[in-house]
Amino acid sequence: MDHIRNFSIIAHIDHGKSTLADRIIQRCGGLSDREMEAQVLDSMDIEKERGITIKAQTAALSYKARDGQVYNLNLIDTPGHVDFSYEVSRSLSACEGALLVVDASQGVEAQTVANCYTAIELGVEVVPVLNKIDLPQADPANAIQEIEDVIGIDAQDATPCSAKTGQGVEDVIEALIAKVPPPKGDAAAPLQALIIDSWFDNYVGVVMLVRVVNGTLRPKDKVLLMATGAQHLVEQVGVFSPKSIQRDELTAGQVGFVIAGIKELKAAKVGDTITTMTRRAEAPLPGFKEVKPQVFAGLYPVESNQYEALRESLEKLRLNDASLQFEPEVSQALGFGFRCGFLGLLHMEIVQERLEREFDMDLITTAPTVVYQVQQRDGTVLTVENPAKMPDPSKIEAILEPIVTVNLYMPQDYVGSVMTLCTQKRGAQINMSYHGKQVQLTYEIPMAEIVMDFFDRLKSVSRGYASMDYEFKEYRQSDVVKVDILINSDKVDALSVIVHRSNSQYRGREVAAKMREIIPRQMYDVAIQAAIGSNIIARENVKALRKNVLAKCYGGDISRKKKLLEKQKAGKKRMKQVGTVEIPQEAFLAILQVDDK
């Protein structure tokens, strides 16, 4: 056990985490040069394209160190994005050490800090590494200073390297072996194994990635999953070097995979503990929690006959993504579709992109909403994740909305514009600190404001330099109202939004004006109204197309002309009673693009 090192790599997006992992795998001979490819641990196309890691992957490597000993290194690749923070914390709790990779030319950024604090809280040894030192604009001294200022760990002996050229990678591995403690655990104790991640394989069912903390896991063992209480028979165990290699057993301190003929991913929850039926562990490993979706949106197929196909696609995605939730939903405007719950905005984008890409779906997405808690007059509490389900205003005692703590990092030139943005978004400043040229701002902002377009606007006001991460803090009472859009006094449920009262007038006017541009002119007048309950707060009219009925009258009596006009008017009125307005596809997208002032 003294020769095992379990570690993961923490970094902000684009600081070179996956490239460094590639180099370490190559140096340890995990893959031959022919099999080596860029970002070898990122298996989905979308991961490679966006350069982000979504699922955790592992590689078990053996390395002959300079002291002549052979060490087993288990690299656990973690997602770096804030939406997947629970998966990150599970991956980190399976390690004893973490390489903190910081881009020497850019310094510390938000997600580095968020994940690094998670690591320190879990008692993981953090080993700082400066990457990209081959760049002409690299400034290692400044980066070291920032690591010490912002994160507060000693970085004087941070290892410089360049993952691209491979320079210094050996030093990184040596530093890792020297600083990271070997795993503690008892191979003879009852089995406790932590599920770090799980995914679905078409041939063998669910593959679970586990870290064995105590005990030994062998094929033919009957195991119990402690959170769900399900029992399974282990079929095979093994390790990834990134290729899968079967082993006879996994013992304490090792990281590997387990296949137990599980049919669906819901049964193998990330963070759950596996133990054997014959010798049960006293208690599960700490830290397990159910992942709850934070952001909801409606997904509808453009063609209504694609509904079944959309359901199948969502079910296939759920095989590989247990945090995705969905339930059928009917909208008068959009027909049949699904209400889906996501961990955050990035997660939502990825699901949409995978549906469009891997399953060829054409989708309409409604505006994302967060989960509100509604206290009713009769004392019951509802959770509302869909504006259409919001009860009548007369029944509502109070509405609570989720508040998140947002940490923002940016160069000091952009502080003013970022603070203005946060204030517009109803943010309350909690803290502000300077670290060299970088500034850290902490705000509490309602989550609803974040999901709208906060991230895009943050990037634009800071020219792409600001980075952020957020975490849920609490529910707070808030004066929010539901704004309905009526077209010819029919409610269009898919266009309803929940906004703060101070912003509702503006929002209603904007949406109505936007609709007026988008809805094509009909043979009769179309009235577009925005309403809160029964109060109309904004109205726009789309004028009717009309024929010039007076063209055939030359001169003649005014009463003749009046008669023709009245007749036309009566005809239009009749049409208006029976006509329905087709709402074009763009209208639903336009809702997402209404800019806040």
UniProtKB/Swiss-Prot annotation:
GTP binds at D14, H15, G16, K17, S18, T19, N131, K132, I133, D134. CDD domains: EF4_II, EF4_III, LepA, lepA_C. InterPro entries: EF-4, EFG_III/V, EFG_V-like, EFTu-like_2, G_TR_CS, LepA_C_sf, LepA_CTD, LepA_IV. Keywords: Cell inner membrane, Cell membrane, GTP-binding, Hydrolase, Membrane, Nucleotide-binding, Protein biosynthesis. The keyword Chloroplast does not apply. It catalyses: GTP + H2O = GDP + phosphate + H(+). It comes from the Bacteria. SUPFAM superfamilies: EF-G C-terminal domain-like (SSF54980), P-loop containing nucleoside triphosphate hydrolases (SSF52540), Translation proteins (SSF50447). Residues 2-184 form the tr-type G domain. GO terms for cellular component: plasma membrane. It is found in: Cell inner membrane. GO terms for molecular function: GTP binding; GTPase activity; guanosine tetraphosphate binding; ribosome binding; translation elongation factor activity. It is a peripheral membrane protein. One of its GO terms (biological process) is positive regulation of translation. Belongs to the TRAFAC class translation factor GTPase superfamily. Classic translation factor GTPase family. LepA subfamily. Required for accurate and efficient protein synthesis under certain stress conditions. May act as a fidelity factor of the translation reaction, by catalyzing a one-codon backward translocation of tRNAs on improperly translocated ribosomes. Back-translocation proceeds from a post-translocation (POST) complex to a pre-translocation (PRE) complex, thus giving elongation factor G a second chance to translocate the tRNAs correctly. Binds to ribosomes in a GTP-dependent manner. This is Elongation factor 4. The gene is lepA.
